[in-house]
């Protein structure tokens, strides 16, 4: 680990010093932009879905080959299950990170939501990636806080429970781009709340939303949905000390997309007050109150109105997490989560840091 860390320290030093002046603000690279022409091509495999390009080159099998991870995934007592909240506002968290060096202060913000009452948070990989930097802390001081409430206030710390190795591998070379491009493919992560910031015991249960990883029908077009998140437009305009207010909005599905899987991997939703930087990682719920997707990118405002968004489907999450680990999303929410998070860190964090370092060469 010391060798990989040394390599990574060099990468991170370059990463942190490329800026010429001290700057405090929200990093726009956490909000990937869609290429303007990706929505115009129809899939040859399924004419019911619009094709999004897949940049994925290979699927790392490190977790499939890790005996420790496989054992941790099936061991331990079954935890709490089932929804404990119905209002998405109650389930929202804001993930707020800072990275301080003598040269700069970098601030990032994103949304997440409780998907399991044992304290599991779902968010974007492009938000959770900062916890990889926080785990290293080489050339500066990294701090990430899970904030809750209205306005968002610091409440918890969290550890990485899962981030797709394929996503990190595919995005390592562009993670420090000011405005990286992306479609949302495998852009998800699971975090586990580890402690409170005020020294109090952790809650007996967290406000988790009901969710569904069922395949979305093409009849979803124009269906009503609810989107929620912590949009950071005011923070961008007024500075990092601005209160972050959770928002939810009624909107509807405008289009379904596939990465070539013959299934709906991404869907577009029409504009709302939620649609701004910082909302990435927020849930999208169907009319039954189930989370069916998670916000990953901004949408096409010219087509869907100001504040439009795109979300990856939970069926995409379920299928791809199974492909990379051998276990479904639901299976990742069971068992000894603390042990699994520890094994993830021991097994995968050095591997991911090595990918990040090599991606910058």
Indicate residue ranges for each PLM-predicted region.
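Extracytoplasmic
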Residues: 87-92, 107-110, 116-118, 122, ...
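N-terminal targeting leaders that route proteins to membranes or the secretory/organellar pathways
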Residues: 1-84
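Catalytic-histidine neighborhood of serine endopeptidases
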Residues: 109, 116-183
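Active-site region of chymotrypsin-like
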Residues: 88-105, 194-210, 236-331
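A conserved glycine-rich beta-strand in the N-terminal activation segment of trypsin-fold
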Residues: 77-81, 96-118, 124, 281
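C-terminal cap/linker of serine protease catalytic domains
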Residues: 143-148, 152-169, 199-206, 231-233, ...
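Active-site substrate-binding loop(s) of clan PA
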Residues: 131-132, 170-182, 193-243
């Amino acid at each position: 680990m010391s060798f990989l860390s040394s390599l990574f320290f060099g990468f991170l030093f370059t990463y942190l010093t490329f800026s010429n002046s001290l700057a405090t603000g929200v990093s726009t690279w956490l909000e990937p932009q869609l290429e303007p022409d990706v929505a115009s091509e129809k899939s040859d495999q399924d004419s019911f879905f619009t094709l999004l390009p897949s940049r994925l080159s290979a699927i790392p099998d490190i977790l499939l080959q890790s005996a420790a991870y496989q054992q941790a995934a099936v061991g331990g007592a079954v935890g709490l299950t089932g929804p404990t909240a119905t209002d998405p506002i109650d389930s929202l968290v804001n993930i707020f990170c800072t990275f301080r060096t003598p040269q700069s202060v970098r601030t990032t913000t994103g949304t997440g939501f409780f998907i399991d009452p044992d304290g599991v948070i779902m968010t974007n990989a492009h938000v959770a990636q900062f916890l990889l930097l926080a785990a290293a802390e080489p050339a500066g001081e990294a701090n990430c806080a899970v904030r809750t409430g209205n306005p968002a206030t610091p409440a918890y710390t969290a550890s990485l429970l899962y981030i797709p190795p394929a996503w990190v591998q595919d995005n390592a070379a562009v993670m420090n781009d000011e405005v990286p491009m992306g479609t949302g493919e495998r852009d998800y992560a699971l975090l586990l709340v580890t402690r409170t910031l005020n020294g109090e015991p952790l809650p007996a249960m967290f406000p988790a939303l009901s969710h569904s990883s069922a395949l979305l029908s093409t009849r979803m077009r124009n269906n009503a949905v609810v989107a929620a998140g912590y949009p950071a437009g005011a923070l961008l305009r007024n500075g990092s000390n601005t209160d972050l207010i959770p928002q939810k909005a009624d909107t509807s599905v405008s289009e379904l997309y596939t990465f070539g899987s013959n299934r709906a991997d991404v869907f577009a939703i029409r504009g709302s007050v939620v649609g701004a930087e910082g909302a990435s990682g927020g849930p999208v719920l169907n009319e039954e109150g189930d989370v069916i997707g998670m916000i990953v990118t901004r949408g096409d405002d010219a087509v869907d109105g100001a504040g439009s968004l795109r979300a990856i489907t939970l069926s995409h999450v379920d299928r791809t997490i199974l492909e990379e680990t051998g276990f479904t999303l639901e299976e990742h929410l069971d068992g000894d989560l603390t042990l699994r998070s520890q094994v993830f860190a021991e097994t995968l964090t050095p591997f991911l840091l090595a990918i990040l370092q090599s991606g910058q060469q």
